[in-house]
Each structure stands twice: as structure tokens, then as C-alpha cells.
Amino acid sequence: MSSAKNSNSHGDFFTPLIEGFVEMFQVLITKAVESFPKLLKNIGTPQITINQSSMKLVLSMLDCERQTVDQAHLGWAINTNRPYPLEYFDPSKNTFIVGSSGWGKSNLLSVLQENCIQRKQGLIFIDPKGSLEAIRNFKKLCRYYGRNYYIFSEFDKEAGSFNPIADMTNSQRVSMIMRSFDWGKRPNQYYLNEAQKALDDVLSSLTAKGEEFDLHDVYKKLKTEHNKEETSGLISQFQLLLNSDFGKLFKKANEFGKPSATMKKAWEEKACIYIGCSTQGYSTLAKTVGKLFVSEAMNLSYWIGKTYEDSHKIKENSLGLFIDEAGSVIYPDFLDLVNKCRSSGINVYTAVQSYSDIEMVADSEILMKQFFESYSNWFIQKQTNTENAEKLASACGTFLAQKTTLATESGSESGKGTIREGYEYLCHPDIIKSINVGQTILLEHNPKWLSLINVRDVRGSNAFKDVKEVDKSAPIAPIKKGLGRK
């Protein structure tokens, strides 16, 4: 009987504990069931917090000479001590490249252009240098990957005819021509208006015939029907352009009857276009040529956006628009293209030699600040000007750091001092001024990250290796050099 009492007393003792554990377990199960959908929702979208100080670049990193030759890599990321795969790079966020002449900008552009073609994109390269080497490298790239191409050059044997005014409305043609010509800093508004009216009248008359026409047709009709003082500036600029070495290229068909090239046609074919307009050899005239093609690119972006609703179709036909020495050929309205081109699948790569080149476009620092907001990928190379280096260092950002000061007595440390917080550069201006040939600082946004990279030497790429002399001017379509590459 006593044993039964003991058993009951033990049961009475443990019963509240057991009930408490059961109740707590039920609460945990309930909470888990309530939280489970939230856990599922967050799977795959982890929230990563990056410590700003971990991105800091230091001067000693510039001594690293480690390289990578893998064509899948942009180069060797010194601060993370590993290759930087090109698949990490997002060209759809638009890319701004700034670097002094002779410090590896052309090599970087070639790496990015090859990546563009590897992504099965079209390619348009507006090059105010217009050099033989640039054209040869462009052809090598296209031949290796079996891509059709069109060349605009005053001296290249494969250069064809172009008709940049073909695929647009008359209003767009008027805007394109007027902003491409040089009217001076303070043009007479009356003369501008009269020139536009005459141009619109000529274009309307030519359009009514229902046949393709080119800049030569516009010039002839202007000279015949609107040759007066108010339009003399417009007619003179047409004459200088079309009588120049570039004039023979602005025709609706070449001497063999082959149709002229347009950016719309290249976009539909996924073909590549090289535009050579040497500002060194032709100054203002070459700038006019460059602006004509930049305007055509803007109109292509507009046409794609209004024609296609299917974002997948646009993505399939995306293209890279590369503009080297951009300060020579762009104008303030160019930012409209940069800000809106993502919806049309155009990835813009804008390269200049210095921060000041963009300021000169509109004679204002405001434009440069707008550029800061419009490009999410920044490649920064050598800058010799202290002010430019400081502005670019500021763009890279700062982080909050502790700074320690020590007190001294009679020239020796006293053991006393202060600790205070202050902001330090993630990339000090001295790094930008001291960067070596072939190195670049890559600033990316969303998420923000800073990399110091030894850019891969494109001469090691199979696409850019020298070919036999007989192949240098061979037709492209039948060549299949890319089949054996690794």
C-alpha cells in the first residue's frame, strides 16, 4: 500500500512538468508552422551585409603582377586574390571607362567586346581614332566567331556604304542632322529655324516619292531649291561633309549595287559594325560623322522599344554599343540613350581619357554628375591630374574608420593619445595616379563592390592572334576559324 502511495506521489510530482513540456512543444510547433512560409519565401534571396572596409584598396596592391590567360576571365582580381570571371560582370547596367592614353584602355575595350560577342550579342564600335590596328582587331574578332560585319572607314578596302537616315521619320532626320552639325556656341536662332524648315521641306518632298534616299539626295535638293542666305550654313556643312573622304560612304548603295548598311539591319542580323571617324585627321568633320551615328543608335533604341513588347525577343537581339573617345562625338542628349537603353536591350560602353572630357561636352560639371548616376559599372585607369583623381576616388566611396593619435613628450611617445572616428577613401587618389599599365579599378553597384584588376592581355586570346597575310582581307562569311578553339 505504501508503494502505491509512493507511485501516486511521484505521478503527482511529474504531471505538471510533463504538461508544461507538452504545452511548450505545442507552442514551438505552432510558431514553426506560422514561420515556415516566410522561411520558404526567403530561400534563395539571402540578405548579405558587406563590410565597406573590406573593399579598401592599398597602394602596395599595385605591385602584384599575377595574370590569367583564361578567355572566360576579365583578369586577375588583386584584392581578392583570384580571377574575375566575366560571367560576374553585368553589361546591362551600362559601363563607363576612364583612363589616360597608353595605359591599357584599348586592351580593356577588346576584352569587353569579345565578351559581348561570346554572349551572342551584336556589336557597334564608334571609334574616333579610326586606326588600322583597331580595324584589324575588329575584323579578327568577327572572323574568329563567324560574325558578319560592316566597316565604315575612309581608307579600308572592305569599307561599305552606309545610310544612317534610312530607318527613321522626317522629324527624327531633322533632329539628327541639326545636332550633328557644328553651329557654334551661340547660334542665331532665326537662321537655325530657317535651316530646319528648309530641311523638313526637302525631306518631305523626297519621302513622298516612296524611294530610298540618302544625304547626297538631301544636299542636292537643298542646293537647288533652298539656296539662300538663311540656309547657307546648312548647305555649306553638307558640302564639306559629302565632298570629304567620308562622302563616298554616305550612299544608299555602293558602286556594285550592294545595299547600304544601317544599324537596324545589323541589329536584325546580329551583325557587327565598326565606325572609324578619326578626329586626329579630320577634326570637326569627324566629330560630325560620329554624332550622326550616335544619333542613329539613339533612334534604333527608340524603334526597338516601340516595336517589340516581348522582352525575351529584345534580350535575344541585344547589342553592345561601344564609343571610344566619347567626348568627341556625344552631346548632352546622349544621356537619354544611356538612361533608357536597357528597355531596348542596348548595353552602352562609354570610354574617355579623363573626367574633364565629359564636362566639356556641355561645358558643365552637372553633366558629369548625371553620368555618375547613369552608369553602374566604372572602370578607372591611370589619371595624372590630381583634381580628376580626387573626384574619381570620391565616386568610389569612403568608409568609417578609427584613427589613433599619440602624444609625445620630449620627442618620445608618452603612452597617451586619442581615438576618433573619421572617413577614409576606399580607393585613395594616389592609387588612381599610380596605377600601372594594364591595371584597372572596377567599381560596381547593386551590390557595391570594388576590385583592383590586372586586365587579361587580349593578345593571348585565340581571337586576336595574328593570322596569315592572305586572310587579313578575306571575306568573312565562309571562314570558320572558331571551330577548333578551346
Which positions does each model-derived feature cover?
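Glycine- and small hydrophobic-rich membrane-insertion segments that are intrinsically disordered
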Residues: 1-43, 399-421, 483-485
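Short acidic-hydrophobic sequence patches enriched in Asp/Glu that either
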Residues: 13, 17, 21-24, 28, ...
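P-loop NTPase motor domains
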Residues: 17, 28-82, 86-346, 430-452, ...
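Conserved ATP-driven motor cores of ASCE-family P-loop NTPases powering translocation/secretion/packaging/pilus
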Residues: 166-171, 338-340, 344, 351-441
